Amino acid sequence: MSALHSIPHRSKKLPPLRVGVGGPVGSGKTTLVEMLCKSMRERWDLVVVTNDIYTKEDQRLLTVSGALEPERIMGVETGGCPHTAIREDASINLEAVDRMLAKFPNADIVFIESGGDNLAATFSPELSDLTIYVIDVAAGEKIPRKGGPGITKSDLFVINKTDLAPHVGADLAVMEADTQRMRPAHASSRPYVMTNLKTRAGLAEVVSFIERRGLLHAA
């Protein structure tokens, strides 16, 4: 990992970009955050806030994987419904973000990983500037056409674990067609990406989306 002083920080005319990563339990949110950190940490100054209901397991997993230095990863225990902590009452996460930015004032990006939740989960605009919603193919071919704010309103929709399609009888072409129908503006304002994070397939597209839509190269 490069020394942080050598990283070209985002223009300080702009506040840190806050990227919310949501999705059901087991969809691959933590793996995506891990791989985003490892792909982007040479170029950008990163910190992470993870959410779990009763533990700090995702913080532990990211730390063990070496995604970032341990002090750059903070876990919060939300209790109750995980969507409440990112939407109706985001105070616990807002406080965590403030604490991380006090420790790392040059941070360019704050990744906020929600606890696993249902298709209705969304991030408060006070907490997240960009939202990424992750589902996995193993949950069923029907998931994209079920709709819900995570699928229809997220800035980027990620269909993960594409390698499992033949094992669960899912047709990726059907999932893609349903996604295009549920996200009619997908080609411009609401894109989607098919990923297999085991092989890094699709990861570069997610990174490019964050850098482009997050104005990370703005002067």
Curated annotation (Swiss-Prot):
Instruction: Return the annotated region ranges for Disordered.
Output: 1-20
Which Pfam families does the UniProt entry name for this protein?
cobW (PF02492)
Indicate where this protein resides in the cell: Cytoplasm
> Which GO cellular component terms are attached?
cytoplasm
Q: Name one GO molecular function term.
A: GTPase activity
- Kindly state which keywords UniProt assigns to this record, in alphabetical order: Chaperone, Cytoplasm, GTP-binding, Nickel insertion, Nucleotide-binding
Q: What is the top-level taxon of the source organism?
A: Bacteria
Which Gene Ontology biological process is one annotated for this entry? urea catabolic process
Which parts of the sequence bind GTP? G23, P24, V25, G26, S27, G28, K29, T30
Record's subunit section: Homodimer. UreD, UreF and UreG form a complex that acts as a GTP-hydrolysis-dependent molecular chaperone, activating the urease apoprotein by helping to assemble the nickel containing metallocenter of UreC. The UreE protein probably delivers the nickel.
- State the function annotated in the UniProt record: Facilitates the functional incorporation of the urease nickel metallocenter. This process requires GTP hydrolysis, probably effectuated by UreG.
The protein depicted here goes by the name Urease accessory protein UreG
